[in-house]
From Swiss-Prot:
Keywords: Mitochondrion, mRNA processing, mRNA splicing, Repeat, Ribonucleoprotein, RNA-binding, Transit peptide. PROSITE patterns: CRM. Part of large ribonucleo-protein complexes that include group IIB introns. Residues 60-71 have a biased composition (Basic and acidic residues). Residues 24-82 are annotated as: Disordered. GO terms for cellular component: mitochondrion; ribonucleoprotein complex. Residues 143-241, 263-359 form the CRM domain. This is CRS2-associated factor 2, mitochondrial.
């Protein structure tokens, strides 16, 4: 006979037995614990797979990559001009007085070009290649475009949302840009070039080097926007081979742009002109990476009435200020007197002053 207390305990004992059976089944299926005390039980250890042997395809890609770094034979190009980093912003007549890196380090890479690098340019072999290149350029351009054809191309490529656009910055017409232009010419008849910064001081120079180095023709020019046409008979399969520069070479060291005493002046007069320029109001305020197509004309016009001109180049950068001064020296022409706190002081020069005086007092022809 069961007592009431036993009746109350019987369901509890049955539940305990059932729980023990479930626990035994769970322990049977549970993986044995790891011996390593650093293992975290909530996470499952993945089996370590042995490293796979490199496939033949991957090995071939590595060999090709190694070949691109140091090819078995150096590349050669039939282009008749010397290879430089920038064609429009450097002048072959400028001779450096030193280099910031050894000249044996060619920016084309070790053993990748058959032209020796002298620290400034990779000179081409002198021969009769220039005449042949000019003849081939005329053949590629073909017959001149009609006005209707020019208008159609301009309407297609002149807009700002054009996908065939190349931005030309303070580096000017660079060597690798020539390859970019030919890449666009594979699928487009023309390419839109947007020019900004220091090179816009001389747009004629940019147009000349674009046509001379690529073989195309500028069919549209509006302020700083150019459209470069490839030619009627252009064949992408016969494009010239252009070895690419792998890095930008360090600029050589050139003589000082500003002398302590300007030519034809004394030290006191030079100092007086510098103070006069600093205390005068600026002729123009130039912005960084702006469009400077009208700066040369405005400086020339100002020199008709004043002797010293100041240009405010705040936030332009000291490097760009000196580049602007070099271009204005050759284009105006004038004499840079001072570069201080991103301010450019220009003097019209003694020769120009004497010419203006002689013209003022010269008798009129009878």
């Amino acid at each position: 006979m069961l007592l009431p207390r036993d009746l109350l305990l019987l369901p509890w004992r049955r539940a305990t037995a059932a729980g023990e059976a479930i626990a035994r089944r769970l322990n049977h299926h549970r993986a044995p614990p790891f011996s390593d005390p650093d293992d975290d039980p909530p996470f499952t250890r993945l089996a370590e797979r042995p490293p796979r042997a490199p496939s033949k395809k991957k090995k071939k890609e590595e060999e090709d990559q190694g070949g691109r770094i140091r090819p078995p034979e150096p590349a050669s190009s039939d282009l008749p001009f010397d290879f430089r980093y920038s064609y429009s912003e450097t002048d072959p007549a400028w001779r450096p007085i030193g280099f910031r890196e050894p000249t044996r380090f060619s920016p084309f890479g070790p053993g990748r070009l058959d032209r020796p690098w002298d620290g400034v340019a990779a000179a081409a072999a002198r021969g009769e290649g220039a005449g042949a290149a000019a003849t081939s350029r005329e053949e590629v351009l073909g017959e001149p475009l009609a006005e209707e054809e020019v208008a159609q191309l301009v309407e297609r490529y002149r807009h700002s949302d054009c996908s065939r656009q190349i931005n030309l910055g303070k580096g000017g017409v660079t060597h690798n840009m020539i390859d970019d232009i030919h890449n666009h010419w594979k699928r487009a008849e023309a390419v839109r070039i947007k020019c900004l910064g220091v090179p816009t001081l001389d747009m004629d120079n940019i147009c000349f080097h674009l046509e001379d180095k690529t073989g195309g023709k500028v069919i549209y020019r509006n302020i700083n926007i150019l459209i470069l046409y490839r030619g009627r008979n252009y064949d992408p399969k016969q494009r010239p081979q252009i070895p690419l520069m792998l890095w930008k070479p360090l600029a050589p060291i050139y003589p000082r742009l500003v002398q302590n005493v300007a030519d034809g002046l004394t030290f006191e007069k030079t100092k007086e002109l510098r103070n006069t320029g600093l205390n005068s109001s600026p002729l123009m305020k130039l912005t960084r990476n702006g469009v400077y197509v009208n700066v040369v004309d405005r400086v020339r016009e100002a020199f008709k009435t004043v002797e010293v001109v100041r240009l405010d180049c705040s936030h332009v950068g000291s490097s760009d200020c000196k580049k602007i001064g070099v271009k204005l020296r050759d284009l105006v022409p004038c004499v840079p007197l001072l570069f201080k706190d991103e301010q450019i002081i220009l003097w019209r020069g003694k020769v120009k002053q004497e010419n203006s005086v002689s013209l003022q007092f010269s008798p009129e022809p009878s």
